[in-house]
Design a protein with these regions (language model features):
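Hydrophobic alpha-helical segments of small multi-pass membrane proteins
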Residues: 1, 27, 57-60, 70
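Flexible, glycine/small-residue-enriched loop-and-beta-strand segment within the central core
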Residues: 1-48, 75, 81-83
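Short, glycine/charged-enriched secondary-structure capping and boundary segments
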Residues: 22, 69-70, 84-87
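Short acidic capping loops at alpha-helix termini that bridge into adjacent secondary structure
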Residues: 33, 51-52, 67
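Short-chain dehydrogenase/reductase
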Residues: 36, 54, 70-71
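Beta-rich strand-turn-strand
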Residues: 39-55, 59-63
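Acidic, glycine-centered active-site loop in nucleotide-sugar glycosyltransferases
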Residues: 66-67, 72-75
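Terminal amphipathic alpha-helical/low-complexity segments used for targeting or macromolecular assembly
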Residues: 74-121
Length: 121
């Protein structure tokens, strides 16, 4: 779970309390092992994020996410499987995770790479 993620377990009550004063709706949120939730995503009540799933940054997740799938957007929609994501981006894998590079060392390394090593959208 990255920075700015909000996990909501209830909501919607204020809009109907003029008709039903004690109205409150709750839903448990479950985040399974190895799930990744991108920055500033909103996870709504009752949602399960499946094992190994990826939620793109800024997504609003209103429905459960199956295991090993990638979702994104508002509302979050299916993009691809995690395996398809890996295959699509494998050529851009710079393999620097876990090398304990300082920010200065990482910057120096990245500046030595040719342009085609970087992901383009």
């Amino acid at each position: 779970i990255t920075s700015g993620v909000a996990i909501h377990t209830h909501g919607g009550g204020n809009s109907v309390r003029s008709r039903i004063p004690d109205f409150d709706v709750f839903g448990k949120v479950q985040i399974e092992d190895w799930a990744y939730i991108g920055a500033y995503s909103q996870i709504m009540p009752g949602v399960t994020i499946g094992e190994g799933a990826i939620v793109a940054a800024g997504s609003v997740v209103t429905k459960s996410v199956p295991p090993r799938t990638v979702v994104g957007g508002n509302p979050a929609r299916y993009i691809c499987t995690v395996d398809e994501y890996i295959q699509k981006n494998l050529e851009f894998n710079l393999q620097i995770h876990g090398k304990n590079l300082s920010l200065k060392e990482k910057r120096k390394f990245l500046l030595t790479l040719p342009e085609e090593k970087f992901l383009k959208k």
